[in-house]
């Protein structure tokens, strides 16, 4: 058995920061189950810390929106072709696509056609945006690792094998975050009201939301001079964020921190945040938020036609109602964003009720994700 384990090789692709975090926890489970395993493909810093060998920088795939993807399509398609060829040439027991369905599903289908077993971690949001992906998913994967409890039953109806593994973030983020410790770590005043600005982890998001968030922050500070602002930025985007801040009315008034979005969310009283996985992180930190979403108008028009639910933000989708405000496209004005964010600071009773709701959601998502992932992967390998 030990000799067999030395040959265990997994290939993974995580296309953005949120996928990197999920994949890091997946690798924890795989490493515990198969201590001698190797993992290769495309990943970010969380994966690299666990010994992952990344063949391309993760940032190459971190593009969002139809128009934005078209701009980079040739490069992304080239990476996918080269990756597929190398995996088929060098071999792997299993390919696991971590989120990034636009990139991974085609790759998974191509590898599966050639006999490689495949799994997908994070069910594509067929229940929210893209129902046509069901057929593609069925053809592409042997198994889906689902992070939301209602997804396996939906996939079973479509003949797709799936397991609920819990949401890894629910184990990473404490049930009762330590605001005081986070503020001490960031050098923030213990009593000052703090707003966390999270305009997104992709360049396209930063382009559409960065200026708006900073303009909203300026309006908030005019209304409440005692406010403090923190903005976590990935190292790869720090230069661009610094330029945005320097050219805004918030120059010298925003504390820019490297990565550490969790520290910012733990420390803050409220967050102004781009739609995406970070909104679920904010919910697990029990923080009130205002969700913003802005992209190329053509991309939004195409996406809106495929929308199946009235919500965009994950906290609202999971709660089945608007528990936090969403300001989308034209509604995401600096004035609107500022007013909605300040409203939370003036409504402690509403904040308390929201925290109770988010605590229940946290408990529902909390599972032993690394072990459940390894269990599911082992079944695929043995199947």
Language model features by range: what are they?
Residues 1-383:
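Nucleotide-activated sugar donor-binding and catalytic core shared by glycosyltransferases
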